[in-house]
């Protein structure tokens, strides 16, 4: 499998989000460049973005600003989740995706993540136990060494 083929099968949501200095619509569309505006809006809805997007002067057409600094960390993370929802890849990697979220944003992100991972393979990189409590399998890795793997369900 080529690197490009592998990349097409993985959605990655990182702890630190980067937004481009273009519209929020185009930032979400980075998940799938040929997506229609309607598909981008649907991904934004599923990612719980509409509440803050509707408050912006130009809505989803507002500019993200340099590195997305006009948005809070939790809002940037939800834009990144919208990208991943739009991409609809069969494998989703969440790398500390809720690390910077305040309680309100974390709740909305959890709803967005539930939407994102339906019928998908999910890999969660986390330091907090609550982030992985619903996992089928937990793998403990320390300094690139696989320490153990087990199920927490009984």
What are the roles of these predicted feature ranges?
Residues 7-16, 24-27, 41-49, 61-154:
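ABC-family ATPase nucleotide-binding domain "signature/switch" substructure
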Residues 21:
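The conserved phosphate-sensing helix
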Residues 29-37, 51:
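ABC-type ATPase nucleotide-binding domains, specifically the catalytic core motifs of the NBD
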Residues 32, 53, 68-70:
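Short basic coil micro-motifs at the edges of alpha-helical modules that engage polyanionic partners
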């Amino acid at each position: 499998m080529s690197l490009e083929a592998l990349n097409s099968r993985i959605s990655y949501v990182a702890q630190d989000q980067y937004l481009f200095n273009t519209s929020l619509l185009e930032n979400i569309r980075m998940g799938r460049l040929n997506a229609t505006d309607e598909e981008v809006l649907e991904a934004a809805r599923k990612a719980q973005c509409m509440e803050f997007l509707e408050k912006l002067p130009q809505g989803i057409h507002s500019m993200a600003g340099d590195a997305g600094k006009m948005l809070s960390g939790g809002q940037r993370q939800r834009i990144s989740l919208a990208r991943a929802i739009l991409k609809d890849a069969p494998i989703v990697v969440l790398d500390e995706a809720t690390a910077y979220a305040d309680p309100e944003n974390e709740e909305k992100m959890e709803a967005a993540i539930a939407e994102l991972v339906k019928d998908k393979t999910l890999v969660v990189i986390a330091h907090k136990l609550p982030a992985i409590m619903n996992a089928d399998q937990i793998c403990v890795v320390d300094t690139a060494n696989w320490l153990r793997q087990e199920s927490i369900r009984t």
